[in-house]
Swiss-Prot record:
<dbReference type="InterPro" id="IPR050514">
    <property type="entry name" value="WAP_four-disulfide_core"/>
</dbReference>
<feature type="disulfide bond">
    <location>
        <begin position="141"/>
        <end position="153"/>
    </location>
</feature>
<dbReference type="GO" id="GO:0004869">
    <property type="term" value="F:cysteine-type endopeptidase inhibitor activity"/>
</dbReference>
<feature type="signal peptide">
    <location>
        <begin position="1"/>
        <end position="30"/>
    </location>
</feature>
<feature type="disulfide bond">
    <location>
        <begin position="36"/>
        <end position="62"/>
    </location>
</feature>
<feature type="disulfide bond">
    <location>
        <begin position="49"/>
        <end position="61"/>
    </location>
</feature>
<keyword id="KW-1015">Disulfide bond</keyword>
<feature type="region of interest" description="Disordered">
    <location>
        <begin position="100"/>
        <end position="123"/>
    </location>
</feature>
<feature type="disulfide bond">
    <location>
        <begin position="45"/>
        <end position="66"/>
    </location>
</feature>
<feature type="domain" description="WAP 2">
    <location>
        <begin position="119"/>
        <end position="167"/>
    </location>
</feature>
<feature type="domain" description="WAP 1">
    <location>
        <begin position="31"/>
        <end position="74"/>
    </location>
</feature>
<keyword id="KW-0646">Protease inhibitor</keyword>
<keyword id="KW-0964">Secreted</keyword>
<protein>
    <recommendedName>
        <fullName>WAP four-disulfide core domain protein 2</fullName>
    </recommendedName>
</protein>
<dbReference type="InterPro" id="IPR036645">
    <property type="entry name" value="Elafin-like_sf"/>
</dbReference>
<keyword id="KW-0789">Thiol protease inhibitor</keyword>
<comment type="subunit">
    <text>Homotrimer; disulfide-linked.</text>
</comment>
C-alpha cells in the first residue's frame, strides 16, 4: 500500500504544478516588446494593470513604485493619461511623476535630458558591478537618454540594464 500512496502523492504534485504554472508558459501571457521607461512612484499604489496584455496596442504594464500603469515603452516625449473602456489608466509616453502635494495625480512631463555630443550618450562611465547584485533583474532602459538627470544606462549585475549614477 505505501507504493500507492506515493503514486497518489506524485500525481497530486504534478496536478498542482500544472494548475499553478503561470499562463505565460502556454503563450497566453506573452510579454510585449520594449522596455518600460523609469517611472517615479505613484503615491496611491493603484495597479491599473498587472500584465502587458491588460494594456491596449503596444503599451506595456510598467511598475511605478507600488503601483502600475500602461505605458508606451521607451518613450520620453511628453504624454498624457487616458482611461480605456475597461477603466485601465494609460500613460501614452513619458515618465509618470507625482509629488506629495499632488494627491496621487500623475504628471507625464519628461525630465530635461541633455545630450552630450550627437549620439545621446551622457558623460561619465558605468561603474563596475559586483556579481551578484541585489535588486531588480529586469531591463529599465536601453540608452542613456531614457535615464533622468545625469544617470547612465548601465549593466545592473544580472545581465540587464538599469539607470545608474556614473563615475567621472
Amino acid at each position: 500500500m505505501p507504493a500507492c500512496r506515493l503514486c497518489l502523492l506524485a500525481t497530486g504534485l504534478l496536478l498542482g504544478l500544472l494548475l499553478f504554472t503561470p499562463l505565460s508558459a502556454t503563450g497566453t501571457r506573452a510579454e510585449k516588446p520594449g522596455v518600460c521607461p523609469q517611472l517615479e512612484p505613484i503615491t496611491d499604489c493603484v495597479k491599473a494593470c498587472i500584465l502587458d496584455n491588460d494594456c491596449q496596442d503596444n503599451y506595456k504594464c510598467c511598475q511605478a513604485g507600488c503601483g502600475s500603469v500602461c505605458s508606451k515603452p521607451n518613450g520620453l516625449s511628453e504624454g498624457k493619461l487616458s482611461r480605456t473602456a475597461t477603466g485601465t489608466t494609460t500613460l501614452s509616453a513619458g515618465l509618470a511623476r507625482t509629488s506629495p502635494l499632488s494627491r496621487g495625480q500623475v504628471s507625464t512631463k519628461p525630465p530635461v535630458v541633455t545630450k552630450e555630443g550627437g549620439n545621446g550618450e551622457k558623460q561619465g562611465t558605468c561603474p563596475s558591478v559586483d556579481f551578484p547584485k541585489l535588486g531588480l533583474c529586469e531591463d529599465q532602459c536601453q540608452m542613456d537618454s531614457q535615464c533622468s538627470g545625469n544617470m547612465k544606462c548601465c549593466r545592473n549585475g544580472c545581465g540587464k540594464m538599469g539607470c545608474t549614477t556614473p563615475k567621472f
